[in-house]
Amino acid sequence: MNTLFGKAKEEAKPITPKSVDEYPEAPVSLGITLVNFTGDWRTFMPVIDESKCVKCYICWKYCPEPAIYIKEDGFVAIDYDYCKGCGICANECPTKAITMVREEK
C-alpha cells in the first residue's frame, strides 16, 4: 500500500539496493519461521483427504511457511508446528483435498 501523497510522493526516490549489505536492518530475519513455532493461537487447521489428493503439490508451492512437506509415498502432510492456519493450501487445492477445520483446544 502506497502511503505517500502529493509532493512527498513526487519527490520520493525508489530504494534499490545493489547488494544484500545495502538493505536496511529489519525486525524480522530470514528463516525466522524455522525458529518460531506457531503456538496455540491458530483457529483453523488444514486436514488432507488423501483419497482426493492428486499429488500436484500446488498446496506445497503456495504455502507461505515451511508447513507442508512431501512424504515418501508422494502425498503431502502438514507440520502443525509451523502451520499458521491461513487456509491458502485449501483455497488453492484444485481437487478440494484440503479442508479447514476448527482447531480443538
UniProtKB/Swiss-Prot annotation:
Its EC number is 1.2.7.7. It is an enzyme of class 1 (oxidoreductase). It catalyses: 3-methyl-2-oxobutanoate + 2 oxidized [2Fe-2S]-[ferredoxin] + CoA = 2-methylpropanoyl-CoA + 2 reduced [2Fe-2S]-[ferredoxin] + CO2 + H(+). The keyword Nucleotide-binding does not apply. One of its GO terms (molecular function) is 4 iron, 4 sulfur cluster binding. It comes from Pyrococcus horikoshii (strain ATCC 700860 / DSM 12428 / JCM 9974 / NBRC 100139 / OT-3). SUPFAM superfamilies: 4Fe-4S ferredoxins (SSF54862). Keywords: 4Fe-4S, Electron transport, Iron, Iron-sulfur, Metal-binding, Oxidoreductase, Repeat, Transport. The lineage of its organism: Archaea, Methanobacteriati, Methanobacteriota, Thermococci, Thermococcales. Coiled coil: none annotated. [4Fe-4S] cluster 1 binds at C53, C56, C59, C93. Its cofactor is [4Fe-4S] cluster. Residues 44-73, 74-103 form the 4Fe-4S ferredoxin-type domain. The keyword Lipoprotein does not apply. Heterotetramer of one alpha, one beta, one delta and one gamma chain. The gene is vorD. [4Fe-4S] cluster 2 binds at C63, C83, C86, C89. NCBIfam families: PorD_KorD, PRK09623.1. It comes from the Archaea. Gene3D superfamilies: 3.30.70.20. This is Ketoisovalerate oxidoreductase subunit VorD. Binds 2 [4Fe-4S] clusters.
